[in-house]
A protein has these predicted regions:
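Short acidic-glycine-tyrosine-enriched beta hairpin
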Residues: 44, 81, 87-108
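Glycine- and acidic-residue-biased ligand/ion/polar-headgroup-sensing regions
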Residues: 58-61, 67-88
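Conserved short histidine dyad/triad with adjacent acidic residue
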Residues: 48-68, 96-98, 102, 106-107
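Divalent metal-coordination and catalytic microenvironments
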Residues: 41, 100, 122
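Extracellular/periplasmic catalytic domains that process cell-envelope and extracellular macromolecules
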Residues: 31-34, 45-47, 67-68, 75, ...
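A short, N-terminal "cap"/entry segment at the start of jelly-roll beta-barrel domains
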Residues: 1-49, 138-147
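Double-stranded beta-helix
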Residues: 92-95, 112-147
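Short beta-strand His + acidic residue motifs that chelate non-heme Fe in jelly-roll/DSBH
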Residues: 63-65, 83-84, 105, 110-116
Length: 147
């Protein structure tokens, strides 16, 4: 079954099938940073309805403070994700989330993240459409705009 199905139904994907799905740093709901890839596992984050994406973030990456219009829930799949809430990146506000950790990205609540020495995979689900808006427009990755 296609991963981009827009209706809830039966879905079974192996890791190889997830890796084969659409990817890029310019996907809707992604940070827009070069090197960060987003794979759509289910649904379409640009449209109304349930979606799930997998965010792959390289080691030593900082994602500045940003928001999304929708409420999102996330699970850290691999690596340690350092995540915090606030209008500006603040290393003191980060909480280290190892694999299996769960966190929320409430709609319009500013948050930020960072990876350490290892890459991180995070599975994020929400009810679209979603977007990404940086709190400080100067932190918006070049060419990213609002995604």
């Amino acid at each position: 079954q296609a991963a981009s199905s827009s209706t809830l139904g039966q879905l079974r994907l192996t890791p190889a099938e997830v890796r084969a799905n659409q990817s890029g740093s310019d996907q809707i709901g992604s940070s827009g940073l070069a090197g960060v890839s987003t794979k759509v596992v289910f649904g379409d984050p640009s449209k109304s309805g349930f979606y799930t994406i997998v965010l792959s973030v390289p080691a030593h990456t900082t994602i500045q403070a940003h928001t999304h219009r929708d409420d999102r829930m996330a699970v850290v799949v691999s690596g340690t994700w350092h995540f915090g809430y606030g209008d500006h990146f603040d290393e003191r506000a980060l909480k280290s989330l190892p694999p299996g950790s769960v966190y929320s990205e409430p709609g319009a609540v500013t948050h930020f993240a960072q990876t350490g020495a290892e890459p991180v995979l995070v599975e994020i689900s929400g009810f679209g459409p979603t977007d990404t808006r940086y709190f400080d427009p100067a932190n918006t990755p070049k060419g990213a705009g609002d995604r």
